[in-house]
Amino acid sequence: MNIVITGCSQGIGAELVKLWSTNHRVFGISRNREKLEMLKLSLENHENFSFISESINDLNQDSLTEFLGQIKVDVLVNNAGLLINKPFLEIQYEDYKRVMDVNFWGAFHLSKLLLDRLSKAKGQILNISSMGGVNGTSKFPGLSVYSSSKGALTILTECLYEELKEYNVRVNALALGAVQTEMLDQAFPGYKADTSPKQMAEFIDSIVVKGS
């Protein structure tokens, strides 16, 4: 399989790279080049992992062709995420734009850019969402922008699930609860989640690769 994954320099994304690079070709898109290089060096089959350290929203067809060549894409995992924990009255437009650019627009943009490659492979898109972005679930103070961005991603997933059937592309979202990632620790110092990034990566593998 050829798998493209965003937000893979740490956390769940990095664990997925470790897992999938054993038997698949993995193409990572993330901004932290230093962490990506360290991740590649740590892999047993490091030749199976290629990366580009660039903002998703700056990518275009030319830069993707330079990165991916002419390969088909079997799986796209839109995993990149940004969490800001800030009271509603303190939120500025810049906060909103940063979060929406990463959590929503990045997934929208990359899914569109890769649609032809995914269609040729009869592939799948997995959007990593959050329970905070699901209607009717518990919501928490300070997460108005984050939860709203994940809600937008969830609705986008539902729309694309229907719209991309004619392209033979399956689209799903996984709404995560708390996972003990660096992002969670930065937003909620001292909070301990029950699920590790490795455990979540193994679960994602079970539905994306083993379940495909």
Q: What positions do the PLM features span?
A:
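Conserved glycine-rich cofactor-binding loop
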Residues: 9-10
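Conserved glycine-rich Rossmann-like NAD(P)H-binding loop of the short-chain dehydrogenase/reductase
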Residues: 24-38
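Rossmann-fold cofactor-recognition segment
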Residues: 43-59
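Conserved NAD(P)H cofactor-binding loop of Rossmann-fold oxidoreductase domains
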Residues: 79-85
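Substrate-binding pocket helix/loop in short-chain dehydrogenase/reductase
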Residues: 87-88, 95-97
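Catalytic loop of short-chain dehydrogenase/reductase
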Residues: 124-152, 157-158, 162-165
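C-terminal helical subdomain
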Residues: 166, 173-174, 189-212
